Amino acid sequence: MELVLKDAQSALEVSETTFGRDFNEALVHQVVVAYAANARQGTRAQKTRAEVIGSGKKPWRQKGTGRARAGTVKGPIWRGGGVTFAAKAQDHSQKVNKKMYRGALKSIFSELVRQDRLIVVESFSVEAPKTKELKAKLAEMNLEDVLIVTPEIDENLFLAARNLYKVDVRDVAGIDPVSLIAFNKVLVTADAVKQIEEMLG
């Protein structure tokens, strides 16, 4: 299959297995959920009554004081006592096989092509790290909410995009399923397309 280059009167021959496969919604969903879960830190800590530091002595005798009976000052109803169901650190990570991850990315790229959300250009860069220059360049292409994918990070382009809320610049190694879905358009250079094909097989 061919992808038409937006800035040149030519087309790029690409693999149908990477850019022309059926959309596997279940697989993409599983990989996106796993990606989000793996980003969770999971660090939290509260103490149970057993972990609270304090005396194990009964605070007052059982009978005769007129007060409610109490056996410990570390119980959850006491100020400074333990928490009933104390939150503990958790590992939320989910394992995703490489084959599944690559399959999900192929599925997403294929769907982007079908929805005309993937824009391929011969090259894309800015002269200086100026947001104004990048904004004008994107406006010419009628792009506002866009992920720009290049073979490697262009420092000028990266710095120019840093202050734009709906624009992000990634190299091929830095793309992930969530970013590809999150942006309205994905702008990819011809060299980056070749790298993507090599990466996804």
UniProtKB/Swiss-Prot annotation:
A cellular component annotation (GO) from this entry: ribosome
Name of a matching Pfam family: Ribosomal_L4
Annotated region described as Disordered, given as residue ranges: 46-71
InterPro entries listed in its UniProt record: Ribosomal_uL4, Ribosomal_uL4-like, Ribosomal_uL4_dom_sf
GO molecular function term, any single one: rRNA binding
Keyword presence, Hydrolase: no
Gene Ontology terms describing biological process: translation
Highest rank taxon of the organism: Bacteria
Stored Gene3D superfamilies: 3.40.1370.10
Family according to the record: Belongs to the universal ribosomal protein uL4 family.
Cross-referenced HAMAP family: Ribosomal_uL4_B
Subunit structure of this chain's protein: Part of the 50S ribosomal subunit.
UniProt function note: One of the primary rRNA binding proteins, this protein initially binds near the 5'-end of the 23S rRNA. It is important during the early stages of 50S assembly. It makes multiple contacts with different domains of the 23S rRNA in the assembled 50S subunit and ribosome. Forms part of the polypeptide exit tunnel.
Name used for this protein in its record: Large ribosomal subunit protein uL4
Gene: rplD
